């Protein structure tokens, strides 16, 4: 679910900040880029988000050096992680008002899936916060987002270093499975606590004649990874070949 955000690494088209590709040029969907004010805003947004995820990365390293252990590092970066991941909700607005030519639906799913994992699982089930699986997806997200927002920033400035482009379309090969593994293991670790506490579940009878089993809902989310992960992963592999091979061909003609 949250891992679906990684598809942003391969389906982007436009002006910076949108999860499905803010910052990448699109001749097919938008021949003109955003105006100067919009570009300035998107550059600022992406710079701030890059800096935010760098703060998270530095926080992880400092906590590890201070403790001498990678266990329970989540607590050292909990606040900035929640703040900057929740801040990505603005990317839905960017798509909705048209300053980024990406799908509102797709971007909403991608952003909300991560926000869900942060707030409805990791925040709500305190017992999982010390799990190593949380650190696994946090590290994967952190590296991914630093690269992604840097990519968008430089693209908006029309000065994209090849190294950043290469990293964006290459490191997902490791980071995507790493993030998926961390997400699934975290949800799995939360299941017994959710079931025991009846967290977010609604039982009958009630005046609305409606029931909801959050435990079963989390299981369905985990099952959804089975068809989604290989489909998205191999699509991204295909996109990598196409984009990087095009870059290499372009270099030959320069």
Swiss-Prot record:
Q: Which residues does the entry assign to the active site, renumbered to this chain? A: 176, 183
| Lumenal-side positions | 61-79, 126-130, 188-217
Which InterPro entries does this chain map to? Tyr_Pase-like_PTPLA (IPR007482)
Superkingdom assignment = Eukaryota
Q: Where is the composition biased (Low complexity)?
A: 1-11
Got a GO cellular component term for this one? endoplasmic reticulum membrane
Where, in residue ranges, is this chain on the Cytoplasmic side? 2-41, 98-107, 147-169, 236-254
Q: Which residues carry this modification: N-acetylalanine?
A: 2
- Segment Disordered: which positions? 1-33
The molecular function terms in GO held by this entry are:
3-hydroxyacyl-CoA dehydratase activity; enzyme binding; very-long-chain (3R)-3-hydroxyacyl-CoA dehydratase activity
Q: Which UniProt keywords apply?
A: Acetylation, Endoplasmic reticulum, Fatty acid biosynthesis, Fatty acid metabolism, Glycoprotein, Lipid biosynthesis, Lipid metabolism, Lyase, Membrane, Transmembrane, Transmembrane helix
Provide the membrane topology annotation: Multi-pass membrane protein
User: Lipid metabolism as a keyword?
Assistant: yes
Q: Glycosylated residues: list them.
A: 209
Q: What is catalysed by this protein?
A: a very-long-chain (3R)-3-hydroxyacyl-CoA = a very-long-chain (2E)-enoyl-CoA + H2O; (3R)-hydroxyhexadecanoyl-CoA = (2E)-hexadecenoyl-CoA + H2O; (3R)-hydroxyoctadecanoyl-CoA = (2E)-octadecenoyl-CoA + H2O; (3R)-hydroxyeicosanoyl-CoA = (2E)-eicosenoyl-CoA + H2O
Biased composition, class Gly residues, residue ranges: 12-21
> Which Enzyme Commission number(s) are on file for it?
4.2.1.134
Give the pathway. Lipid metabolism; fatty acid biosynthesis
Query: Where, by residue number, does the polypeptide cross the bilayer?
Result: 42-60, 80-97, 108-125, 131-146, 170-187, 218-235
Give the main location: endoplasmic reticulum
Q: Where in the cell is it found?
A: Endoplasmic reticulum membrane
Briefly state the protein's biological role: Catalyzes the third of the very long-chain fatty acids (VLCFA) elongation four-step cycle (condensation, reduction, dehydration, and reduction). This endoplasmic reticulum-elongation process is characterized by the addition of two carbons to the lipid chain through each cycle. This enzyme catalyzes the dehydration of the 3-hydroxyacyl-CoA intermediate into trans-2,3-enoyl-CoA, within each cycle of elongation. Therefore, it participates in the production of various VLCFAs involved in multiple biological processes as precursors of membrane lipids and lipid mediators.
Identify its protein family.
Answer: Belongs to the very long-chain fatty acids dehydratase HACD family.
Subunit-structure text: May interact with enzymes of the ELO family (including ELOVL1); with those enzymes that mediate condensation, the first of the four steps of the reaction cycle responsible for fatty acids elongation, may be part of a larger fatty acids elongase complex. Interacts with BCAP31. Interacts with TECR.
**Name listed for the protein in its UniProt record:** Very-long-chain (3R)-3-hydroxyacyl-CoA dehydratase 2
Which species does this protein come from? Bos taurus (Bovine)
The opening ranks of the lineage are: Eukaryota, Metazoa, Chordata, Craniata, Vertebrata
- Its gene is HACD2
